Regions:
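Conserved lysine of the Walker
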Residues: 32
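Glycine-rich phosphate-binding loop used to anchor ATP phosphates in small-molecule kinases
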Residues: 71-117, 121, 138-139
């Protein structure tokens, strides 16, 4: 799929004070949401107003009966990035808790949100499958879903993330502290 151009009204916004965006990406059940749960209060402890945009929650509004087609995913992640951009523009720090299986999705967000960091949550697929409480991988293995990242659909891991976190060795609280240290050094 060809990368779309950025409309003028989505050009990067530069008047946003201290706000920034963090995209936490990784395979389903890799530990993204667990890290985000530990991260949000730590960021708030730094005096930041924080909003988490969790993909499953937002998807229920944007695509209530998802097909996970390429076109639908592109629309969804562009809408998610747009929402994040608007929040950052109004001084709200945004944490994206979303697989965003293609680099293109995350790169689009980076292009419209200047103060942006990408966190790669790394975990072997077998461990993700063992941790999977939502049944995502089971549906994929049983043929009920044909677009599970890591199974039928590729997951494009970040090439140069701002931080890599191995959730098989790093507890969520430690991961959140590492992210806060990075944010403090980079933005605060």
């Amino acid at each position: 799929m060809k990368e779309p151009s950025i409309p003028d009204h989505l050009s990067p916004i530069t008047h946003h004070g201290l706000a920034f965006a963090i995209w936490i990406t990784g395979l389903p059940a890799s530990g993204k949401s667990t890290i985000v749960s530990a991260l949000k209060p730590q960021l708030e402890g730094l005096g930041l107003t924080v909003e988490v945009l969790e993909s499953d929650e937002v998807r229920r509004v944007i695509t209530p009966i998802p097909t996970y087609s390429e076109a639908e995913r592109d629309l969804f992640y562009r809408a998610l990035a747009f929402t994040g951009q608007k929040l950052v523009a109004h001084g709200v720090t945004v944490v994206f808790d979303a697989t965003a299986s293609r680099r293109l999705y995350r790169d689009f967000a980076r292009s419209v949100i200047p103060r942006f960091i990408e966190i790669a949550v790394e975990c072997p697929l077998t461990t993700c499958m063992e941790r999977d409480r939502k049944g995502t991988y089971q549906k994929g293995r049983q043929g009920e879903s044909l677009t599970v990242p890591g199974l039928q659909s590729p997951y494009e891991a970040p090439i140069n993330p701002d931080l890599r976190i191995d959730t098989t060795t790093t507890p969520s609280g430690d991961a959140a502290r590492e992210i806060c240290d990075l944010v403090t050094a980079k933005f605060l």
